[in-house]
Structure formats: C-alpha cells, structure tokens
C-alpha cells in the first residue's frame, strides 16, 4: 500500500485509468497513513468523505471515456484549515474558531472537490495564517519530515501552510491547498523540499477563505512535482462573482505549457537580493541553477529592484492594518469563542484576550496603531505609497526580462525547539514578500540539500498571469536538480 503513496498525481491518474489499482485502494492507503501520522499535520480527518469520493471515482473510471475524466479524480488531497468546508469544522487553528462549522464551501475547495479529489481532512497551520514556522497553532506545532543531520534535531516545516507542506512531503496526501499572503505557500514548500506555487493575485477566488490581509491573501497549491502543481492549479483558478477582485482572464491549461524549453528567455537576477544573512549554500545553488538555465539557452541578466529593501516593513504594516480590521468581527457575539462577563465591553475584551494567540494579538495591536488617527498618514498611507513603488520596480523589470530567479528563503529550516524573536521570523519572508506586495505569480522549487541534509529551494517570479511560464521554468530547474523527496518510512 505504501507504494501507492509514492506516486505522483499523474501516475495516480494513469494507474486508475489502466485499472492497475482502484481509487478505493489508493485512498485507503492514504487514510491509513493519516490515521497514524506523527507530524501533527492533520487536525480534522475526514475518511468517510474521502472514501465516498474514491467510490465515485471508481464508478466514473468504469463508465467514462478517458478525456472526460479530471486528472484529480480519486486523488487524495488535504485542505488548509483556512478554507471553509461546509459541514466540516474550520478553525484557522485558533481557539477563537475551535468549534466553528461553516454552512458554506469556499470556492477553491469546492472547485477542487468537484474535480473529483478525495479530501482526507483539514491541515494544521499558523493561527489565522500568521507565522513562518507553524508554531503558532492552537493545536500545536507541525513537524517537518526532514531531520537535521548534525544533531538529529527536528526542524520546522515553515508557515503558515506548514501542515500542507509537511503532509505532502510526508506522503500523507498527493497535494494540498494552502494560502499565501507573504510567502505562506512558497516558504514552507522550500523548507519541506516540495513545490509550492502562488498564482497572480485574483487568479483564485478568496470567497470562503478566512481573511487575514485581504489585499494580499491568495490561495495556492503544494505538491511533490511541478507538473502536479500545474494540474492542481488548473482546478482551482477561475473567475468568481462572489469575489470582487476575481480575475475574468481565461485560465489556460497550465500543464500543456511545460515543455522544458527556456531558449531565448531572459532570466533576471536582482542585485538587491544578494543580502547579508543569506546562506552560502543557497547562494551556491542560485548561481549553479542560473548557469544551468544559461546552458539551456536562456539569457541571464542582472536587474535592479531598488525598493526591495523596504518590502518587509511595508508588508508588516499593511498586513497588520488589514488584520486589525478583518479580525474585528471576532467579538464573541455572533459565533466562535465567547467569555461570559458582566458587561458587553468586558465580554469583548475577555473574549479577544483569551480567544486569540500571542502572535495574532501582536499584529492586531500593530495594525490598530498604524491605522489610528495620529499615525495613519505617517505609517499606513506611506506604506501603501512604497508598495506602489515596489510594484512599479517589477513592472519596469519585466519590460526587459521574462522571469526573475531568487531564493525562496535565506536559510534552511531552523530547529523546532528554537525560539527566534519575531524580527528574525519576519526576515524569513524577505524573498517571498516582494512578489506578494506586487501581486505577482511565484513558484518555489527544490534545488538540493544543505550539508545538514535539509532542503534548499529557489523561486521563479513571473509577470502577471504568467503562471504557465513560471511552471515551465521551474520544470527545467526540477529536471536539472532532481526531486529531493525523502524516502518513505
């Protein structure tokens, strides 16, 4: 049964078409793994729903023509617990929503399930998607499948989609839904040695995705290969009338653009990303991959993104301001956690003090301060102006180049028991935040292992709506570097 868990989504689809195994057998193998997992990746398990989808898939394969069957039919997947799932607990990994059961389905999870995917359950994450290590969850931290070689220590899976990345890397599911506000798909994918893609802002509907920072939030996917990411992304993209920023641009068949050809493509290397604190091993792999792309016909050129140095403070001001607004709805009145008190004001205060975790409260306070009447112009308005400059830097760069190649994270994953201060945690997102502020598509792809035996990754950033292009460049990198999948235990 373990052999079935090693398969890619494409291999699963081919095996199901050829009747090499049934969807029930495939899903049962994954259910068994999820029931016995020790990573704390799944916080809600839905074996009955997965088996129902598997039986429906087997029925489809028995009577439908091949070209009418979705490539995700019967494929076991996990869904980050930020996406509302009708009738299934959705908590955002917060005490505030510990027992919340939505009455509606998020658009992206609905599209995924309508494609025939079998949902194994809901995945652990940093509370309200705020964090870079998946150590801020009300349900406890997630463990990475990779272990540090020198001392045998466990390491973090990254965040906030740590459960999504760890579950895919650990062969608990073939693919997972995640969300990316400032790097929450790409950074954990990098730490876990898997592929993570954030599409252009507006490509995927935000309807039913619990809001963190609305001008930045975007759904994404995590898989074990670039081609698998293309297949999953195809399923969840598309226009949605229920999301005001949803794009009406047609969604191409991303998988058909993966041809391994980068001849004539101009790849930009921004000088501003060569900064202090970046691992020498990551720099070495960055240079090695750039050389490989050049050998395969791409033109590698230097570019400048002068306002990159402001990205982290700008991001944390904007996302914290939007957090303080979005999370104001959790007051103990309508739904969610509630502390009974003598007065309404006391009930509000106690509910929010006990219902939110430390990191969430920290960001609410920062955001409330930035939006206050005495500081709005000084902080929030100025941050939005610099965000526009960051976006313009990318627009100018893409007038001369096709793609940008940068690291996904400055270092390998750090120890699970290490407690870096919040500033260090912020810096983990230094390479992912700029693309988020600009709303650009970006993909993280593994490129090797460090001397400690931990995954290293690079990121390909593309122009607006060029998900197909970054998937193709990432596939070329994947061909050169190989997949760094950890052996199945």
Swiss-Prot record:
EC number(s)?
6.3.5.7
What keywords tag this UniProt record? ATP-binding, Ligase, Nucleotide-binding, Protein biosynthesis
The UniProt entry, under Pfam families, shows: Amidase
- The domain of life is Bacteria
Cysteine pairings via disulfide bonds? none
Kindly give the InterPro entries that the UniProt entry links to this protein: Amidase, Amidase_CS, Amidase_dom, AS_sf, GatA
Q: Which reaction does it catalyse?
A: L-glutamyl-tRNA(Gln) + L-glutamine + ATP + H2O = L-glutaminyl-tRNA(Gln) + L-glutamate + ADP + phosphate + H(+)
Q: Which residues form the active site?
A: 80, 160, 184
Please give one Gene Ontology molecular function term for this protein: ATP binding
Biological processes annotated in GO: translation
Q: What quaternary structure, including any partners, is listed in this protein's UniProt entry?
A: Heterotrimer of A, B and C subunits.
Family listed: Belongs to the amidase family. GatA subfamily.
Q: What does this protein do?
A: Allows the formation of correctly charged Gln-tRNA(Gln) through the transamidation of misacylated Glu-tRNA(Gln) in organisms which lack glutaminyl-tRNA synthetase. The reaction takes place in the presence of glutamine and ATP through an activated gamma-phospho-Glu-tRNA(Gln).
Q: Which PANTHER family match?
A: GLUTAMYL-TRNA(GLN) AMIDOTRANSFERASE SUBUNIT A (PTHR11895:SF151), TRANSAMIDASE (PTHR11895)
Q: What is this protein called?
A: Glutamyl-tRNA(Gln) amidotransferase subunit A
């Amino acid at each position: 049964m373990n052999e079935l868990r090693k398969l890619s989504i494409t291999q699963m689809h081919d095996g199901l078409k050829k009747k090499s195994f049934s969807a029930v057998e495939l899903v049962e193998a994954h259910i068994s793994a999820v029931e016995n997992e020790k990573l704390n990746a799944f916080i809600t398990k839905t074996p009955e729903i997965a088996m129902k989808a598997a039986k429906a898939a087997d029925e489809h394969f028995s009577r439908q023509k091949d070209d009418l069957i979705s490539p995700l039919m019967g494929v076991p997947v996990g869904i980050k617990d930020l996406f509302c799932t009708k009738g299934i607990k959705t908590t955002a990994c917060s005490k505030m929503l510990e027992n919340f059961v939505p009455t509606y389905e998020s658009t992206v999870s609905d599209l995924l399930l309508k494609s025939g995917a079998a949902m194994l359950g809901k995945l652990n994450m940093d509370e309200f998607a705020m964090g870079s290590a998946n150590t801020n969850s009300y349900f406890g931290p997630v463990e990475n499948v990779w272990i540090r070689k020198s001392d045998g220590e466990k390491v973090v899976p990254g965040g906030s989609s740590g459960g999504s990345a760890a579950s895919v890397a650990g062969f608990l599911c073939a693919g997972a839904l995640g969300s990316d506000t400032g790097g929450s798909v790409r950074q954990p994918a990098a730490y876990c040695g898997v592929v993570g893609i954030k599409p252009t802002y507006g490509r995927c509907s935000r309807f039913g995705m619990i809001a963190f920072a609305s001008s930045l939030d975007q759904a994404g996917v995590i898989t074990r290969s670039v081609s698998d990411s293309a297949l999953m992304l195809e399923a969840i993209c598309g226009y949605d009338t229920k999301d005001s920023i949803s794009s009406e641009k047609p969604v191409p068949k991303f998988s058909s653009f993966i041809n391994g050809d980068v001849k004539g493509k101009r790849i930009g290397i921004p000088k501003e990303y060569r900064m202090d604190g970046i691992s020498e091993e990551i720099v070495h792999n960055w240079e090695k991959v750039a050389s490989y792309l050049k050998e395969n016909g791409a033109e590698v050129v230097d570019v400048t993104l002068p306002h990159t140095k402001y990205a982290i403070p700008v991001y944390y001001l904007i996302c914290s301001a939007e957090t303080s607004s979005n999370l104001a709805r959790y007051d103990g009145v309508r739904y969610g956690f509630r502390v009974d008190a003598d007065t309404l004001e006391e009930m509000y205060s106690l509910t929010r003090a006990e219902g939110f975790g430390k990191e969430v409260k920290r960001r609410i306070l920062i955001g409330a301060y930035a939006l206050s009447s005495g500081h709005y112009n000084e902080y929030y308005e100025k941050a939005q102006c610099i965000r526009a400059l960051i976006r313009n830097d990318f627009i100018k760069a893409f007038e001369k180049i096709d793609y940008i190649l940068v690291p996904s994270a400055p270092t390998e994953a750090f120890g699970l028991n290490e407690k870096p201060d919040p500033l260090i945690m912020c810096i983990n997102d230094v390479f992912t935040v700029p693309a988020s502020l600009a709303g650009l598509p970006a993909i993280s792809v593994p490129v090797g292992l460090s001397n400690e035996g931990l995954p290293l990754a690079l990121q390909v950033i593309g122009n607006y709506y060029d998900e197909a292009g970054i998937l193709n460049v990432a596939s070329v990198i994947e061909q050169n570097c190989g997949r760094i999948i950890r052996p199945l235990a």
